[in-house]
Every structure is written in structure tokens, then in C-alpha cells.
């Protein structure tokens, strides 16, 4: 079977099945009453000065990408059904999944911005998000589950509960668009944390490394152990550390109040507590290896 070239709008009352490589010539819209299936590669062909083409898919059934998707400007799927991805998807612009995105393998999504309105089912696979803008992970209005390792190389806009069975790595900046809870075995928060006055709870079984100073986070809660790899960590509201806290350098903590339930290891560094209200240090906890403590 030879290559298939798609142009314009294609409407079917039943399914659409493309068993060979597909080239998208110009902006294409596919409307189907049944499944839409691509067995091999989907490739966008530049249309002169118009640039890479857009691909819009509308079906209440399943859309399956069996091969890589590349050279598209934007990719948009409608609500209802699911999008099943079996390989990497790359766009120069935005990716909008209004239906559930199901990972059939570990893969990377690359583009401008990403929206997962229909949720994500990782099915035990790894997901890497490589977007120059923000990838919006809204666990408040939809379900994000089944992802093993989650890595974001660019920005993330987060809300609700985001749970992984493997590690979470946020290499870019993270923005809270609602009260957010992150759950998994371990995490690295390497970029800035912009809270937009929302609460952040991190619940990891292994120590979490925080390298950001934090900005406009309301209440912060860490259920597990934390490594503070920053000179300052600031919240608008309270800071609650339920696990062990370890300093990797001199650190100032600023907020309305602080609570340390399980001790702090200064590792030879200085700690400044800049809380406006009461700082609670549990009597069973131990503050040790501190160079100096300032209140």
C-alpha cells in the first residue's frame, strides 16, 4: 500500500483507516462516525508561506496514531472517545487533546503548548513533555493517572491531583492554576514555582529536591522528606513539613507560620526562620548540624 495524501475536509459516517504513511497537505479536518486509525507515520507537508499544516480530528470513537506524528503546526482532537498514541508526537504549535489521551508506549510530546482536557491514561508508560510554552495538567477537572515516570522539560500549569507510579521531574517552571497535590515515589522541582495564591501539597515517598525560591504559593505542605536546595523559600501562607528537612546551603524560610513535625538536618548550614506567626517544632523532632539559627 502506497502513501496516502490528505487534503481539506474528509467526512465519513463510519470509520477511517489509513494503513500506510499519511502526508497532510494543507490544513486537514477528519470527521468520522467511527474510529480513525493511522497505522504508520503522519507527516505534515509545508504549504509554502502558510507553513506547517493543522490537523483536526473529530470522532466520538477512538483515534489511534500507530507511528510518529511530525511537522504539523497544531493537532486538535474533539471531546469523546480517546486518542491512543503509540509513538512520539511533534508539532511546531499547540497540541489540544479534548478526549482522553492513552499512552500505548513510553513517548515524548513536543510542541508549543499542550492541553489535556480529556485526561491522561498512562497505562504504566513514561511520558515526557517537551513544550516551549506550558503543558496544562488539570487533575482537578479530569483524571491524570497510570503514568510511570513523568518528565516535563518545559513549563507546566498544574491543578488538582497528579499521581504517578514513577518519578516526577519538573525541569522547567511550574505554575499552579488551582490547589495542587503531587503524588509519587520521588520528584525534582528544578524550575521556578509560581503559586498564583494556590496551595501546593507534595507527597513523595523519597526525598524531594526543591531548588526554587517559590513565589505566591499560599499554603505549602510536604508529607515526605525534603531537600531544600535554595537560599530562600517563601509562601504567602503556612509551611508544613511533615517529614525530615535537609538543607544543602544557607536557607531562609518565609511565610505566615511554620511547622516541623519530624526534624531538620542543617548539614553545617545556617537557617533563618522568617514567619509572622508561630513556628511549631515538635518536641520529638531534632534540629541538628546547624551552623546558626535566626528567628
Pin down the residues of each PLM region.
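Extracellular lectin-like interaction modules
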Residues: 1-295
